Amino acid sequence: MITGGGTGIGEALAHRLHDRDNTVIVAGRRTEALDKAAGGRERIHVLPLDIDDPAQITTFAARVIRDFPETNVLFNNAGIMRFEPDLAHKRDLRDAEAMITTNLLGPLRLSNALVEHLASRPGAAIVNVSSGLGFVPLVAAPTYSATKAALHSYTVSLRAALAGRIEVIEIVPPGVRTELVPGQEHEEQFLALADFADQVLSFLERTPTPAEILVDAVLFLRNAEGEGRFGTTLSTINPQPH
């Protein structure tokens, strides 16, 4: 089951998992996008879900357990990114609060709603999609970066807490050509979506599956602190105007 499965990374992973003979549930707010992602594929099922609504999450989880009891893998992929360019002045925090709700509370709530069911299934896994910006933040997107840093930390704790019962995996994307923000799908310096999805699947098919799915393009961010270059990396991705 993949949240945010109607577009971008979620859609690309759904297609590849389906093509490997998996039954896939794609979930998200926009039914039209979900239907397009399903594209008439027999084993892709569409379930609407507003990940920001706790009541909907409860109802959704109950429906998954009832109608798709063999569900054993949850991809917490839904996320939003909004820029916050002026932190030096008092501002409306609705965008920041929306990102916290979608990017952090959403995965926590949905994992909580399904954890007991997943623990009862063989081969169970929770896969959280964070971001390289959780390791070195983009100054113009501080709350987005912070939510992904928090999701990484939560994933580490969840992995330890569920060891032996549910495998917990973190996918750490670099910049990928998706519609996460307007125009991102045209950014030539970002990784092509198809290439990223293919690389992710190659990691997921390894035995054992790595705890973190790290394509080459994200290592610059993921390993910055451990390699003693956090400050220079922060400056590189956040150049100061002249």
Regions picked out by a protein language model, each given a short descriptive name:
Residues 20-36:
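Conserved glycine-rich Rossmann-like NAD(P)H-binding loop of the short-chain dehydrogenase/reductase
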Residues 131:
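Residue(s) in the substrate-gating loop at a strand-loop-helix junction
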Residues 58, 81-97, 140-143:
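Conserved mid-core segment of classical short-chain dehydrogenase/reductases
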Residues 111, 147:
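Active-site helix of classical SDR
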Residues 48-59, 93:
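The beta1-alpha1 cofactor-binding region of Rossmann-like NAD(H)/NADP(H)-dependent oxidoreductases
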Residues 170-171, 182-228:
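C-terminal helical subdomain
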Residues 4-8:
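Conserved glycine-rich cofactor-binding loop
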